[in-house]
Design a protein with these regions (language model features):
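An amphipathic, hydrophobic-aromatic interaction surface with interspersed Lys/Arg
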Residues: 1-192
Length: 192
């Protein structure tokens, strides 16, 4: 049976993990909807501390990091990737409410960026679908190769490009394809 818990404001994430399986879904959803903090205090070995700012969005993460993050569901991997908090113990010492709010924010941003990536694909005509027969769907990891060829850079350099810049490249390419299609349709209609 699941229970509704009133979580103490300063409950640590390591303590929350012990009771997570019996926490009601409503409580988890409420925690995930709490405002994302603007920063967290990272304490290393409980001695040194530094303030880490939470980004307003994940548009500036590298393409390779985004692709890695979109395949991850592990709290510690995401905190290491986005906030550079690499030790499990350091994440466990953070407030549970903050960890859950930040994790929900990361997931929302990954979904938003994935949707934006999917929206950059121009719609295919039936003739194009027939000609391509699945050849044009390169997947997320093929995207690095496409960007490296487009920009004439190595795949390592392409993986380091910010996802926001990659989205701009893809939007420009989509607009070029749509423009060319419209132009061809105008030429066809004027010939008849």
């Amino acid at each position: 049976k699941k229970y509704n818990f009133f979580l103490k404001r300063y409950m640590k994430y390591k303590d929350f993990k012990k009771i997570e399986s019996i926490v009601a879904d409503e409580t988890l959803q409420r925690l995930e909807r709490t405002p994302v903090p603007t920063f967290v205090t990272h304490r290393t070995f409980e001695i040194f501390s530094r303030i880490i700012a939470i980004p307003k969005n994940l548009g500036e993460i590298p393409l390779g990091g985004f692709l890695f993050a979109s395949s991850q569901n592990d709290v510690y991997s995401l905190f290491n990737l986005f906030l550079k908090i690499g030790r499990k113990e350091d994440v466990d010492s953070l407030s549970a409410a903050n960890v859950l709010a930040i994790l929900a924010f990361f997931k929302r941003e990954i979904l938003r960026l994935t949707k934006e990536l999917n929206d950059t694909t121009p719609p295919q005509s039936s003739e194009e679908r027939e000609a391509a027969q699945g050849l044009t769907n390169v997947g997320l990891f093929g995207l690095i190769d496409v960007i490296s060829q487009r920009q004439h850079i190595s795949t390592e350099e392409a993986a380091r490009l910010p996802i926001s810049l990659v989205l701009q490249f893809l939007k420009i390419d989509k607009n070029k394809v749509l423009f060319q299609r419209n132009l061809n349709n105008i030429y066809k209609s004027k010939k008849i």
